[in-house]
Amino acid sequence: DMDNIPFTPPSKKIKSDYMWRDIERRAKFYGFEAKVPAPYPLTQFDLANQIAILGMNEGWGVKYVVKTYQRWFQQGKEPAVEPNLTEILEELNLDTSKIMERAQDPKINHQYIKNTEHAYKKGVFGSPSFIYKGEVFWGDDRLEDCIKWSKLN
């Protein structure tokens, strides 16, 4: 659901500029440079997410997600469009055509829908989100808060 896009409308330029700068700072905390603004909002994301689900089921999903985000935030390449999808899968030495076909299998799509519904029911509205005993913490900068909260409860 992309109805809650934080970087638009143009009337929110001050907030948008702040958010992109914050992403740059957070990236530096993790030891890499972010090329911002990155393509956003995304024009497509379902297939990329379905590929990630397939990959998580098969053990290569984390590598796929890391490469996807590196290309997005370090190279400015939108995650779910070609040739980016194919290039990522090739870098991982995966059979691109088979992965594309299997990622669109109704079982994977069903899992994608169920995962999304589960997230909504838990109160997740953005990424990254962390949940501890029903409490939602949204944003990379809230991970520490989630950990502190878990120690208090």
Predicted segment positions?
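Structural alpha/beta surface segment adjacent to cysteine/selenocysteine redox centers
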Residues: 1-72
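C-terminal cap of thioredoxin/glutaredoxin-like
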Residues: 67-153
